[in-house]
Amino acid sequence: MSDLSHIRNFSIIAHIDHGKSTLADRFIQHCGGLSDREMAEQVLDSMELERERGITIKAQSVTLNYQARDGKTYQLNFIDTPGHVDFSYEVSRSLAACEGALLVVDAAQGVEAQSVANCYTAIEQGLEVIPVLNKMDLPQAEPDKVAQEVEDIIGIDATEAVRCSAKSGLGIEDVLEALVNGIPAPVGDIDAPLQALIIDSWFDNYLGVVSLVRVTQGTLKTKDKIISKSIGKAHVVDMVGVFTPKRHVTGVLRAGEVGFVVAGIKEILGAPVGDTITHSNTADVKALPGFQKVKPQVYAGLFPVSSDDYESFREALAKLTLNDASLFYEPESSDALGFGFRCGFLGMLHMEIIQERLEREYDLDLITTAPTVVYEVVTSDGTTIYVDNPSKLPDVGFIDEMREPICEANILVPSDYLGAVITLCVEKRGIQKNLQYVGSQVSVSYELPMNEVVMDFFDRLKSVSRGFASLDYNFVRFEAAKLVRLDVLINSEKVDALALIVHRDNAPYKGRALADKMKELIPRQMFDVAIQAAIGGQIVARTTVKALRKNVTAKCYGGDVTRKKKLLEKQKAGKKRMKQVGRVEIPQEAFLAVLKVDS
């Protein structure tokens, strides 16, 4: 379809569980993208993990042909986006390829913080946003109230919002009509030199690198010689097509269209996300503004349980990085765990997902150390360094000032749960910045230390608000704070992988809690195991795992007491010798226990 006026590129913005993937299923069914036999629930959530957790992680794309009421056939290019706060970078990437977005809001639950944040991103990128009220089949749906909320919180006129139910299929055609009429057609010159944006790339074992692209001008055909601007190496295009959602080879993509391209690129970094593709003979075409690089917020060490897996672990990470541009990694070695990688993630969910994908898709056994955020440290000679690993922190004597990252958290919560949410934020050392009532909800914004937010704040927030509160946060600045490194010593030996950076006021409490937790998890040995928590040279907590001991006097019947004493002394000497040479194996649960210690 070469007529640009009949193309619509759009994505769907929605909070988790507001029915985005189900709505996509209905679009595919309505436009005949798959036969009824092939329809599975949540077609676009193709990763096993996505279906299991019921969330969208990776952006997907699908091209559909829709016969509109005005008799014309439109080509709809839909780019699916995730809704969870940790995957917001995927959203900004998908939006860069669209002219419009559907804002899907649950008519029973109302607006949630994440949709608000993504909606603002869309408006900033100049997209046309069309509100849709979903789940109209629910008895508790309140469309008028929710439409008013959309207007109050986001500032979009929602009086004309389309009402539908993705589950029952009610109003799906109205949504498609609103989409065709409300979202502008793409602009682009088909005869100009090729310029295409890589939205996503992934590695296929048979095809090499597959890239999802949006062509902004020109035409991309099979057998073309293309280069990506940042790398400049020429490749010949083997396959061009669209997803319907199955791979469908078309042989050509024109300006305004979204599809996939395979060019036999075998090296993993051959087609970086956000790069511009053009023909090798028009290499001077202006590069499109890519996406801002996302900075990881949480760092953790990942180590293979068996050191033989190190190479396959490195390859697995390289393949995942291609598909997930926000994952950062560098080699790291630890005394306790051997060789592994220090990885940077966008949040705790992202970290869990990556670890699960590595274990499932690449069949690896991994140990994860406690996650930390990045701290800014001013040393005594005036240089500023960034520390993302507690064991790399300089000694107390060399530190002039430590600064922790502060983020602004925007929370939307029903007014009944406001008290509990405020209590939680205060407990996490938060400073209230703003509070306003919007309908039956309250919008609160707090400045909170990032390390308090990334650990377990999201889970705690959900539990104190019975799952109704929603959260969106972004980094603001570094701020000076009284921070110290808490070391864990086992039999007077520091275990680098268990070190933590904590606030000085919480340190003794955290140290005690950590020592007690370790006592539960470290199995009893044949000798006493002393567990200590220390700040610098000062021990703030200590506990002992008592030794297992054999009853050596069992064989003595009566007789002289000196006989028993001799046997006990002999046992004592043996235990003492054992303690000097014995090593304590620390189980994987102990490394994870660091996360579970309530701050």
Curated annotation (Swiss-Prot):
The lineage of its organism: Bacteria, Pseudomonadati, Pseudomonadota, Gammaproteobacteria, Cellvibrionales. Keywords: Cell inner membrane, Cell membrane, GTP-binding, Hydrolase, Membrane, Nucleotide-binding, Protein biosynthesis. Residues 5-187 form the tr-type G domain. GTP binds at D17, H18, G19, K20, S21, T22, N134, K135, M136, D137. The keyword Ligase does not apply. HAMAP family: LepA. It is found in: Cell inner membrane. GO terms for molecular function: GTP binding; GTPase activity; guanosine tetraphosphate binding; ribosome binding; translation elongation factor activity. This is Elongation factor 4. The keyword Zinc does not apply. CDD domains: EF4_II (cd03699), EF4_III (cd16260), LepA (cd01890), lepA_C (cd03709). It catalyses: GTP + H2O = GDP + phosphate + H(+). Required for accurate and efficient protein synthesis under certain stress conditions. May act as a fidelity factor of the translation reaction, by catalyzing a one-codon backward translocation of tRNAs on improperly translocated ribosomes. Back-translocation proceeds from a post-translocation (POST) complex to a pre-translocation (PRE) complex, thus giving elongation factor G a second chance to translocate the tRNAs correctly. Binds to ribosomes in a GTP-dependent manner. InterPro entries: EF-4, EFG_III/V, EFG_V-like, G_TR_CS, LepA_C_sf, LepA_CTD, LepA_IV, P-loop_NTPase. It comes from Teredinibacter turnerae (strain ATCC 39867 / T7901). Pfam families: EFG_C (PF00679), GTP_EFTU (PF00009), LepA_C (PF06421). Belongs to the TRAFAC class translation factor GTPase superfamily. Classic translation factor GTPase family. LepA subfamily.
